Amino acid sequence: MRSSRVLAPRANVALAGLGTLGVGGPARWFLRAEHVDDVAAARHWCDEQGIPWFVLGGGSNLVIADRGFDGLVLQIGITGTSTSRDSEDSIITAGAGEMWDALVATMVDRGLAGFECLSGIPGTVGGTPIQNVGAYGQEVSNAIEHVTVYDCVDHTLRSLRAAECGFAYRMSRFKGADEGRFVVCDVTFRLRPGPPTATYGDVAAYLKRSEVTTPTVSLVRHAVLAIRRSKGMVVDAHDPDSRSVGSFFMNPVVSEADRERVAVIAGERPPGFAMDDGRVKIPAAWLIERAGFRKGHVDGAVGISTKHPLALVNRGGAAAADVLRLARAVKQGVGDRFDVWLTPEPIFVGFGVDPDVTFLTKAQG
């Protein structure tokens, strides 16, 4: 796929303002792609120039290095949505540059189930299959029909069925074995009218307190947004606790024996969510607090949210190095106490071989 589009990348563009964490240096080159042809042209341009590229979506899941990125940052701005019907199901295709929560709101307004628990998650549609975003008992992979991608290896546009995407907990082939190979251009979802997902602990408790006996997708979205706001997990310029990447660490999945071992150490049993393989997912926030990192913890220009221990926040003027220092301390503290080693959720951009990033991303401390 060879594009004839003429590119005009900008030089030395600041990146800190393009991420919700607000850290990071400039991009050597920056370009916004509003059509799939722009993606193809940018890939060829980088190959000709011999420089790396990084594909940017909504910037809500990134830690950008203080030195920035010495290559091309390609921001995906492909927009547009379309809807068709297949019996009772609605088939929705959305451009990768569409804002995720706006799409969720539209689908909820139509009474369609499958997205309601994913309300309030920042970023763009294109980032959702990469991370296999999930919350409160739902994962986006359960609603995905196929993903249209630009293949940087053979320079073609491909459609990958959900079964070809390698979806797992907070994982996909796009950030696993094939990381860097594909650029998500649009995503097609299958949704249908029906009862919402409303059994996950926090959501179920909120609905019970609100005396909701027959949940709807709209009521569940309202509940999820309220819960996320209470934790500083909805991006809000007026809320300093939202100057973060959201949950910095994934909830670890452990054996039942390890859960009981943690209970003995902590003197109380951690809550858990049973997985299909017999293991249990326990809250990283629970482990972090019991390792001594409480809500409101301050470490210079960074800290832990006053609302939720999973969010590491930029308190103002922080550098990426400050964020890594705190993240490393949290991972080390949890690992030392419980021998459970947390895995970070965000993507680290521009760091090269960095000892802090290496420590954070390896399976054990």
Where is each model-derived feature located?
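Anion-binding (especially nucleotide phosphate/pyrophosphate-binding) glycine-rich loop
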Residues: M1-V153
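Beta-rich strand-turn-strand
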Residues: L112, A320-L326
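Phosphate/pyrophosphate- and phosphate-bearing ligand-binding catalytic cores of soluble enzymes
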Residues: P9-A11, G17-T20, L62, L157-A321, ...
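Conserved kinase catalytic-core segment
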Residues: H155, A327
